């Protein structure tokens, strides 16, 4: 249970965010939209990433191109976040439940990729690449 608690907590948080009043409120007002967006990307996604990574065998966490992954994930996050905040896509997500679901799924996917990059490796190189991904995304 100690290995999977972040995964379970992330799932419960997603359920609270997506099944509560926020999705409907987010269609009409900016503040609930941002609470939902940040709750998915900055609270649920890191918990899910930590929980999922804990389930991987240790040898899977040793390889990879940390810097290339960090740059690619940062670019992906940038495109997804800013793309959905462009007026046409933002309005489409507010008007259509399907588009809203796609928006939320893409926010979660980008968040998982970003936090997975930050937490994935065991080396200092991976930690530095993860920190770089976070820094680039926050700009």
Language model: regions and residue ranges:
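Alpha-helical membrane segments of multi-pass proteins
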Residues: 1-139
């Amino acid at each position: 249970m100690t290995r999977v608690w972040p995964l379970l907590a992330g799932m419960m948080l997603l359920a609270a965010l997506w099944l509560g009043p926020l999705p409907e409120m987010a269609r009409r007002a900016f503040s609930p939209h941002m609470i939902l967006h940040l709750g998915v990307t900055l609270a649920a996604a890191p918990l899910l990433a930590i929980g999922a990574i804990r389930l991987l065998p240790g040898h899977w966490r040793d390889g990879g191109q940390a810097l290339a992954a960090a740059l690619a994930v940062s670019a992906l996050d940038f495109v997804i976040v800013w793309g959905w905040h462009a007026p046409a896509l933002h309005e489409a997500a507010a008007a259509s439940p399907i588009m809203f679901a796609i928006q939320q799924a893409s926010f979660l996917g980008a968040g998982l990729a970003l936090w997975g990059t930050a937490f994935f490796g065991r080396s200092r190189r991976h930690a530095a690449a993860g920190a770089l991904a976070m820094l680039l995304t926050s700009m």
